[in-house]
Amino acid sequence: MLSFLRRTLGRRSMRKHAEKERLREAQRAATHIPAAGDAKSVITCRVSLLDGTDVSVDLPKKAKGQELFDQIMYHLDLIESDYFGLRFMDSAQVAHWLDGTKSIKKQVKIGSPYCLHLRVKFYSSEPNNLREELTRYLFVLQLKQDILSGKLECPFDTAVQLAAYNLQAELGDYDLAEHSPELVSEFRFVPTQTEEMELAIFEKWKEYRGQTPAQAETNYLNKAKWLEMYGVDMHVVKARDGNDYSLGLTPTGVLVFEGETKIGLFFWPKITRLDFKKNKLTLVVVEDDDQGKEQEHTFVFRLDHPKACKHLWKCAVEHHAFFRLRGPVQKGSHRSGFIRLGSRFRYSGKTEYQTTKTNKARRSTSFERRPSKRYSRRTLQVKGEVWPCSTGSVHNASAQNNDSQQAWGMKSPVPVTSFSSSGPVLVETENLPQNSAADQHDRKRLPLSIDLLNSPDLLETTIGDVTRPSDTSAPFPAPDDVNVATMSHELEELRADCETLKDDTEKLKQLNTEQNILPSLRPAIDINVNSQEEVVKLTEKCLNNAIESPGLNTVRVPPDFKSNILKAQVEAVHKATREDSLLTHKNASVQDAATNSTVFNENNMPLCKDSLTPVHGTTADSDSVLKDATDELDALLLSLTENLMDHTVTPQVSSSSMITPRWIIPQNSTISNGLAGYGVSLTGTEGCNQKDGFSLISPPAPFLVDAVTSSAPPLPGDSALKQKCLLTTEL
């Protein structure tokens, strides 16, 4: 009596009871169902649901499997419960379905807590027979797990469609502002999920816009039911030859696979006997021979463990009863007291026929769809086709301009950006910000040696295009409005005027270098070089170095030079006059220069109307051209050393007694102002200082004269140009 009281009321027994309570509390999941009632002995079962959540249930110690199953179905509010079951693993790692007629403790040996998993036990041969939306949702979750684990093999196209249905059911309609292709990588649909598949899933998802979650899940099931291994319960066995085979339990019968090849199908009506003994499973099938007589064929399969053999037999009995019978087999009332042969297991649930005929869908059901597990997002390497920008190739100009470069005896150190097209081309443009220090720095660093007018289909080429490093992805500066008709008419008149000046071509060689700058005002035509209206400077040091180069004597002086210091030019024009005797001599020199340049350009440079960008232009007769040229040249030569300031180093003075002006042109450089038929090639020594760059100079409009400044008033657009540096000559 004292020992009994000591065991019951002692401190040791009380501590053991408290430890059990703490252990039970720790084993409980977030969702707990207390179903033990007033039972003193309680067991805790933890069930993992298809959506990934866990539910813990407290039951009496001697509770059977059906009680736990009913608690789970009640918690889920699931009516079509006959398609599902609770599965557990034994000590031999063999999966078993919980038998509702037996005690939980006798079946599940590993506990407490006793861990079980809710799974689909019988896959409906026709998903449209599933009446409840919740049932279809759970079927979709089960099929997702089967495909992801590799149990259910799925082709690429089918896997893409099924995954797209999953996204539509979980995320809804595709939204361009919210969803990106990388979003698909956060989900897992197949064991080997590639980037190509994710992009295909993303595109397929867009096609399913407008489907509700219920519709997407129904379409998912209707697509998945056509998979070859849909609803097949596979079990690995060995035959008498020692090779491994697989038996697949289906609604229609038993499939036999050798590896992945299906070699036989035993229909349920043809199977007359199915039993097991230890680890051997015997299958007797009746087939008709050639003469129409029935013959029995016996197949014996071996399994690794007797429990696995019994599990396969029980699954075959349940599949046969669920899909083939109208109702479950009634158990016999009498039992043999001493002798019992075979197993007493019989399927006790409803059949598919009973489930589809008796169950009726409820008017309204509500349940919560839980989101899928997310993973880290992948950075996609392929994002579809990348359309190239509308830019010219930087590798074509070198090959196209080889002839002109060989004629002038120079090479182009940088690639040239050009276009080759048979007609007008639309180019996306980008206006660069004014006074860009970085752009000016890049222009000053790169040598300027480009001959772009050799291409007949050349578009407008700006100084920014010439000096900027070759980059096919960068947009071109914005071209001005093109008036091709006006410029073509002006060019024809210029060529006609220059025909009268061909006799004086040899007189230009007699001009020597002058000390100061000889500006050239161009009142008729003004070509906007770029959006900043900036002109690259040409330093006097570079000019002085160039004049000492022996290769300079062979260079012709073209007329398309332009000085951007218009203010100094206007002051030089109105400041002084010159004697008439000097005008005649200079006029002949000017005519010689214009004729020589025009003839050269007509012979070498093709006309491209699309590349011209005139602002304004005027025409004049040849007589007025010569008269204006002589007057302006006289005024400039008189005020040459008085009004123009030289901000560079003091130039060297030549010892020549005869003062004859000659242009100083940098070597190894080629400048194009964008006018077809007028190209300028500048050649200078490599050691020339190019810190301030070069000045791009355009040809005067009504006349083609060298070193001539018009006395016409400047245009409003020209007055806005900033004074960069003076183009100097050396005496």
Swiss-Prot record:
Residues 43-327 form the FERM domain. Component of a complex composed of PALS1, CRB1 and EPB41L5. Within the complex, interacts (via FERM domain) with PALS1 (via HOOK domain) and with CRB1 (via intracellular domain). Interacts with CRB2 (via intracellular domain). Interacts with CRB3 (via intracellular domain). GO terms for biological process: actin cytoskeleton organization; actomyosin structure organization; apical constriction; axial mesoderm development; axial mesoderm morphogenesis; cell morphogenesis; cellular response to transforming growth factor beta stimulus; ectoderm development. Residues 396-407 have a biased composition (Polar residues). It is a peripheral membrane protein. One of its GO terms (molecular function) is cytoskeletal protein binding. It is found in: Cytoplasm; Cell junction, Adherens junction; Cell membrane; Photoreceptor inner segment. Plays a role in the formation and organization of tight junctions during the establishment of polarity in epithelial cells. Expressed in the outer limiting membrane, retinal pigment epithelium, outer nuclear layer and outer plexiform layer of the retina (at protein level). Its main location: cytoplasm. Residues 29-119 are annotated as: Required for interaction with CRB1. The keyword Transcription regulation does not apply. GO terms for cellular component: adherens junction; cell leading edge; cytoskeleton; cytosol; focal adhesion; nucleoplasm; photoreceptor inner segment; plasma membrane. Keywords: Cell junction, Cell membrane, Cytoplasm, Membrane. SMART domains: B41, FA, FERM_C. This is Band 4.1-like protein 5. Residues 356-375, 396-422 are annotated as: Disordered. The gene is Epb41l5. SUPFAM superfamilies: PH domain-like, Second domain of FERM, Ubiquitin-like.
